[in-house]
Amino acid sequence: MRIGLGYDVHKLVENRPLIIGGVTIPHDKGLLGHSDADVLVHAIMDALLGAAALGDIGKHFPDSDKNFKNISSLLLLSKVKDLINKEGYKIVNIDCTIIAQKPKMLYHIDAMKKNICKCLKLDNNMLNIKATTEEGLGFTGKEEGISANAICLLN
């Protein structure tokens, strides 16, 4: 059994789509990043790579590589799944938290879960996604960015 922990954060900016868990969420700002800046999927990828001792997403998908410009993070997640499977690991479960003051994530979590489970070929009960605010505190509370944490168990 191997445990991995992932964390990601991106700044909210104008003129970018807000994509979290592969879901485009209506909002006046989106997340800035080289790829689609999907903080949830990035945190999950780092957790999976960490548990398998395979480094992090920056090692495998550097922001200096034009091939990853605006790429869907779900495509990268599929590649991470292949990497960990190649090493002989299988996902037991993943638990995640999205930290955002706005917009409310509650209405989008089911679609996020569906996207990620499909990508990783997981049963619905193997992935949990939660969302919280920081009650107006810090950069997420001031709506300057969104962050996500993920923890996974591999066998």
Swiss-Prot record:
Presence of the UniProt keyword Ubl conjugation in the record: no
For site (Transition state stabilizer), what residue positions does UniProt give?
Answer: H34, T133
- Keyword annotations: Isoprene biosynthesis, Lyase, Metal-binding
Note how many cofactor molecules are bound and how: Binds 1 divalent metal cation per subunit.
InterPro entries documented for this protein: MECDP_synthase, MECDP_synthase_CS, MECDP_synthase_sf
| Recorded GO MF terms | 2-C-methyl-D-erythritol 2,4-cyclodiphosphate synthase activity; metal ion binding
Which annotated residues bind 4-CDP-2-C-methyl-D-erythritol 2-phosphate?
A: 8-10, 34-35, 56-58, 61-65, 100-106, 132-135, 139, 142
The protein's annotated catalytic reaction(s) are:
4-CDP-2-C-methyl-D-erythritol 2-phosphate = 2-C-methyl-D-erythritol 2,4-cyclic diphosphate + CMP
Which Enzyme Commission numbers does its entry carry? 4.6.1.12
Looking up PANTHER family in the UniProt record yields: 2-C-METHYL-D-ERYTHRITOL 2,4-CYCLODIPHOSPHATE SYNTHASE, CHLOROPLASTIC (PTHR43181:SF1)
Regarding protein family, the annotation reads:
Belongs to the IspF family.
Question: Which NCBIfam families does this chain map to?
Answer: ispF (TIGR00151)
- What is this protein's record name? 2-C-methyl-D-erythritol 2,4-cyclodiphosphate synthase
Q: What is the phylogenetic placement of the source species in the record?
A: Bacteria, Bacillati, Bacillota, Clostridia, Eubacteriales
